[in-house]
Amino acid sequence: VAAVAPGVAAATGLSLQQLAAALVGQLRPAAVVCVDSLCSAEGQRLGRTVQFSDAGLYPAQADHTRHLTRDTLGVPVVAAGIPTLMQAQEGADLVVTPRALDSIIAHGAALLAGSVNRALQPCLTVQQLCWLTG
């Protein structure tokens, strides 16, 4: 198991797909798990739903070269995310986030990490995983 937090392409100079493809080529994993924030169409869903998909990760950009899928990476891709933003009703270039965003991120990260750990370590109990991860 390896973990990477790639950052944004503007900061790294690499697209997410380029970075993921390089890592998959070097590490040869059985699968890739991607975690990302999601955009919701409804405010009441912000921080209140979790989405898992085996179809891969499709970032908001329409450019298909940014997608992380079995076709683009050569291995199964599972995507997980929690909606943390939505388009503002006024102004096409504005997004809205909840006031409690830091708390939503912290609790959501713990939930997703626990889910991934449980899936990868089915012989361990939830209590054992909590003890191991602190």
Each language-model region and where it sits:
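C-terminal functional extensions of proteins
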Residues: 78-134
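Ser/Thr/Gly-rich flexible loops in soluble cytosolic domains mediating phosphotransfer, phosphorylation
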Residues: 60-82
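Short, ordered loop/turn segments at secondary-structure junctions
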Residues: 8, 37-38, 83-85
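Short helix-loop-beta-strand segments that form the rim/entrance of peptidase-like active sites
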Residues: 1-7
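Conserved active-site and cofactor/substrate-binding residues in soluble primary-metabolism enzymes
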Residues: 11, 15-19, 27, 100-111
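Conserved beta-strand scaffold positions in the cores of enzyme catalytic domains, especially
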Residues: 3, 32-34, 77-79
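Glycine-rich phosphate-binding loop
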Residues: 18-67
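Non-transmembrane, aqueous-exposed alpha-helical and coiled segments at domain scale
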Residues: 3, 13, 21, 69-71
